[in-house]
C-alpha cells in the first residue's frame, strides 16, 4: 500500500520546520546566555572569588575537619578526604599541596577559642562572597531573612562536610566490597568508582545552585546547570593537569613558590566553571519566564 505523496511531503516539511525552530531557539538562547556572561563580568567575579578563596581555604578546611571530627574513625576520614580533594581538585600537584595544607590546618587547629572564632569568620567570608555573587547572577535585589541566612550558612559549614564524610565512607565500603568481588565488579560496575568524583562534584554544585540564591530555582534547571559545570570541571581538571605535567614552566621560574600561582590559576578556573554553570541555570529560568510572558524583553541589571 503506497502512501499519499502529499502527506509525506507535509510530514517532511513539518519535521523541517520543527528542526529550524529548534535551531533558531538554540541560537537565541546561546546569544542571550553569552550576553549575560559578558554583562555580569564572570571573569572578574571568578578572580574575586579566587582571591577570597586563597585567604579562606585554610580556615574553611579547619572548620570542615572539626566537623568531621564528630564522626567515628576521624583520622581515616581525614586521610581519605585529603586524598580525594587534592587528587581530584588540584591536578598533578597533590603531593606538595597535601603536605603544606596538612601543616597549615594542623597549626590552625591549635589556636585558642578566639583564634577559632576568627577562623570561622574567615570561612564565612568565603561563603558571603559566594552568596553575593550568586545573587548577583540571579538578579536578586532583596535581602534574605536572617533565619534563612543562618540555615544556608549552617548547611554549607555543617551538612556539606558530613555529606562528604558519608560519601567517603560509602566509597570505602564499595572499594572493600570490590576487592572481595573483583571479577563481578570489573564485569558489571567497575567504572562506577571512577564516576564518584564527578558525582560528588555534581551533588555539591547542585546544592550550591539550589540553596544559595535568594530566589526559587527549579530542580531541573539546577540539575542541568550542575551537570554542565561538573562536566566542564572534569575537562578543565584534565586539561590543566596535562598542561602542568607537560608544558608548565612555573617550577623553573618560581622554584619552591611555584605552588602559589598554580593554586591561584586553578582556583580561578574552578570558580569560572562554577559561575558559568550558575549563569546557565539562571538563564534557563529567565528564558522560561520570558517564554511564559510573551513580548517581555530579557532584563539586564543596571
Curated annotation (Swiss-Prot):
Give the transmembrane region(s).
51-71, 111-131, 150-170, 188-208, 222-242, 256-276
Q: This chain belongs to which protein, by name?
A: UPF0761 membrane protein Tola_0461
> What UniProt keywords apply to this chain's record, in alphabetical order?
Cell inner membrane, Cell membrane, Membrane, Transmembrane, Transmembrane helix
Supply the HAMAP family for this chain.
Answer: UPF0761
Report how it sits in the membrane.
Multi-pass membrane protein
Q: What does the entry list under GO cellular component? A: plasma membrane
Location of the protein in the cell: Cell inner membrane
Pfam families (alphabetical)? Virul_fac_BrkB
Please give the organism: Tolumonas auensis (strain DSM 9187 / NBRC 110442 / TA 4)
Amino acid at each position: 500500500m503506497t502512501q499519499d505523496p502529499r502527506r509525506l511531503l507535509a510530514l517532511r516539511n513539518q519535521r523541517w520546520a520543527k528542526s529550524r525552530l529548534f535551531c533558531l531557539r538554540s541560537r537565541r538562547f546561546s546569544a542571550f546566555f553569552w550576553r549575560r556572561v559578558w554583562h555580569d563580568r564572570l571573569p572578574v567575579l571568578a578572580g574575586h572569588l579566587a582571591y577570597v578563596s586563597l585567604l579562606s581555604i585554610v580556615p574553611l578546611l579547619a572548620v570542615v575537619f572539626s566537623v568531621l571530627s564528630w564522626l567515628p574513625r576521624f583520622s581515616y576520614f581525614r586521610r581519605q578526604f585529603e586524598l580525594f580533594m587534592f587528587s581530584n581538585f588540584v591536578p598533578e600537584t597533590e603531593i606538595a599541596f597535601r603536605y603544606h595544607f596538612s601543616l597549615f590546618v594542623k597549626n590552625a587547629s591549635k589556636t585558642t577559642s578566639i583564634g577559632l572564632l576568627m577562623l570561622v569568620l574567615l570561612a564565612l567570608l568565603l561563603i558571603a562572597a559566594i552568596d553575593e555573587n550568586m545573587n548577583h547572577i540571579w538578579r536578586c535585589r532583596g535581602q534574605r531573612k536572617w533565619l534563612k541566612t543562618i540555615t544556608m550558612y549552617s548547611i554549607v559549614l555543617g551538612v556539606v562536610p558530613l555529606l562528604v564524610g558519608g560519601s567517603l565512607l560509602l566509597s570505602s565500603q564499595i572499594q572493600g566490597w570490590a576487592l572481595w568481588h573483583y571479577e563481578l565488579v570489573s564485569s558489571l560496575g567497575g567504572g562506577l568508582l571512577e564516576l564518584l568524583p564527578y558525582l560528588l562534584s555534581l551533588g555539591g554544585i547542585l546544592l550550591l545552585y539550589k540553596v544559595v540564591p535568594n530566589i526559587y530555582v527549579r530542580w531541573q534547571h539546577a540539575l542541568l546547570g550542575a551537570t554542565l559545570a561538573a562536566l566542564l570541571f572534569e575537562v578543565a581538571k584534565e586539561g590543566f593537569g596535562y598542561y602542568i605535567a607537560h608544558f608548565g614552566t612555573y617550577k623553573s621560574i618560581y622554584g619552591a613558590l611555584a605552588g602559589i600561582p598554580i593554586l591561584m590559576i586553578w582556583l580561578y578556573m574552578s570558580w569560572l566553571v562554577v559561575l558559568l554553570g550558575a549563569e546557565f541555570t539562571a538563564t534557563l529560568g529567565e528564558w522560561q519566564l520570558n517564554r511564559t510572558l510573551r513580548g517581555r524583553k530579557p532584563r539586564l541589571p543596571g
